[in-house]
Amino acid sequence: MLTMKDIVREGNPVLREVAKPVPVPLSDEDKQTAKRMLEFLINSQNPEIAEKYSLRPGVGLAAPQIGLSKQMIAVHTTDENEKEYSLVLFNPKIISESVEMTHLEGGEGCLSVDREVQGIVPRHARITVKAINENNEEVRLKLKGFPAIVFQHEIDHLNGIMFYDRIEGWVDPYKREINPSL
């Protein structure tokens, strides 16, 4: 079972890497890892389990957040109509996005970020994601609202992007300036 000790925190270089594609057909090891990621999210939303194991509630988790530079995400959330999204995806790509933008009123948070970050994170209101599911099948998901925001946040992790990188005027304290004169 994954716990908060397994979640890498900001400043860890793996969070800034572009994750590697997962070979298909999927290995049993990759399927198990993804299953454990989803299990973490489900457990984190259960008040008794979350309290017992000191889990912070989460709706999405990307493999880089557990130290693996692989294109794998898990999501466990619902939309405004209570439709549940509880799944793992491999090699997810956003293949279309709306011009219309949206954001979460209170800003975004992240299991890998132990502090509150103020600011609005602009996201596309609607997206289509293409990916491989745990049965090695290609799937396409049309998403809007909160699930669209969650999937964009997790797919950003696969590209080395933290949510606060998208806040206008944000300066990353962990980003190193490269001195061209050296």
UniProtKB/Swiss-Prot annotation:
Keyword Iron: yes
CDD domains for this protein: Pep_deformylase (cd00487)
Single GO molecular function: peptide deformylase activity
Disulfide bonds: none
Binding-site residues for Fe cation, renumbered to this chain: 110, 153, 157
Recorded catalytic activity of this chain's protein: N-terminal N-formyl-L-methionyl-[peptide] + H2O = N-terminal L-methionyl-[peptide] + formate
Enzyme class, UniProt record, top EC level: hydrolase
PANTHER family according to UniProt: PEPTIDE DEFORMYLASE, PEPTIDE DEFORMYLASE 2
HAMAP family associated with the record: Pep_deformylase
Protein name, UniProt field: Peptide deformylase
